[in-house]
Amino acid sequence: MPGWDSYRAVYGAEVRAAAREFLDHGWPVVEKSADTLMLITGSALDVLEVPAAIGRGICAQLRAADIVVPVAATPTGSWWYPVTPGSALPAGLREAEDVVLHAGDAIAAPPSQVPDGWVHWRVPPAACDFGVAAADLIFSAAATAVALRVDDDGHPGAQRPAGVVAVGMRS
């Protein structure tokens, strides 16, 4: 396919630039391949991975408190949040489906290509000077998002307590 090699070269340069930027800000990464970066968790940061519905709830709470943190999204429908390392996942979140704390392992970091598509930033770390959110802040927001039923009608961040009907509400 004409142009494919030039595309791969440009994308490879983008991945290498992202790796340098992560490393310059103390985020440990390794190149898994020419188009995949792995963020190493457990020392400088851990990563909380949640389903997108919970991620929208977390973002809504953070937005309401005017807090900006990095957020990545995967093509399989999960979002992840870099958090301060060393905290254990609270019991309520350990029991929640598809909530995973990555500590001491590796996770594909933007702009990585994975089998189902691309991992990308919803909020890039540069938007908050590569700050890592306090684990307890994100865990608390995640616990609240799990406890609330997230609106599935296409309104990102819209949420309401289970059993409450929202009429004419817009987030």
PLM regions: where:
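Structured loops at beta-to-helix junctions and adjacent beta-edge loops in soluble globular domains
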Residues: 42, 51, 84, 102-104, ...
